[in-house]
Amino acid sequence: ESQAIKNPASKVTKAASLLNAKNRLCMSGTPLQNNTFDIFAQMNFLNPGLLGNMEFFRNEFATPIDKFGEQEQKEHLRKLLFPFILRRTKEQVAKDLPDKTETILFCEMEKEQRKVYEAYRNSYREKILGTIDQQGIGKSQLTILQGLMKLRQICDSPAILNEDEKYPNHSIKLDELAREIEENIGDHKALIFSQFLGMLALIKKKLIEDGIPFEYFDGSTSAPDREKAIQNFQNNDECRVFLISLKAGGVGLNLTAADYVYIVDPWWNPAVEQQA
């Protein structure tokens, strides 16, 4: 599973490259997820030196492709990789599989939630503009990301903010999700992904209140408990919902019993959502 070696600088990648083997094979659902360096790390494990060293690859491929979208270099890289990739698509292996239907459910915040959102937005707007004036846009990125993260959390529920002042749970998303589950989880099963553990905790609480059996795991769940949860969801007709943290459950999972997937909060990288 080559998800583990996509970062060429990581210890895992370096350790894997030291393994002595006659044959090497990488398996991945998304070989290219973050940037072109994902490909470099995997190919460097399979055929060390084929794409040159890191500096050569950066100058020759990564910068021209990722930064400037140069078609010629994309095509050159594609031709280099082509003989080493065995690719199967859904069309080839599962013709009977229905198309994925995506629906974006827009939720309008109610008064209390909107009030908290506006207060944080105004506060961070002043803070960000002040930081940009003092340090320039380049050095203000952390403050901007901080502000965006807070607003994203409030969109889920102000209750999940990690602040000294605790806010009550006003969440239009949770209300909508509960309505969706009630309507759709009759003869169906659903996966629910969120990047925020606080939001997953609120959903857990709601499912318990509504008497809906579910399974759960996040990054802290041990491998045996994770496997137990997977088997129960797959094989137990009573268990209709699986709550999963987006980063922990986005890869290396086959949950074929589910036919609904809810992504509660969008991730920065669309490829992570696609994987989920």
Please describe what each predicted stretch is:
Residues E1, M27-P31, T89, S194-F196, ...:
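A short beta-strand-to-loop transition that corresponds to the Sensor-1 phosphate-sensing loop
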Residues S2, S28, L81, E110, ...:
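Residue-level signature of catalytic and energy-coupling elements of molecular machines
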Residues D38-A41, L253-P266:
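A short beta-strand element within the Helicase C-terminal
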Residues P270-A276:
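Conserved SF2 helicase motif VI
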Residues A4, S10-V93, D133:
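Conserved P-loop NTPase motor "coupling/switch" region that bridges the ATPase
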Residues Q3-K6, T30-P31, G198, Y262, ...:
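Catalytic acidic motif of RecA-like/P-loop NTPases
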Residues I39, K79-E126:
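RecA-like P-loop NTPase motor core
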Residues K95-E118, I132-L253, A257:
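Conserved Helicase C-terminal RecA-like lobe
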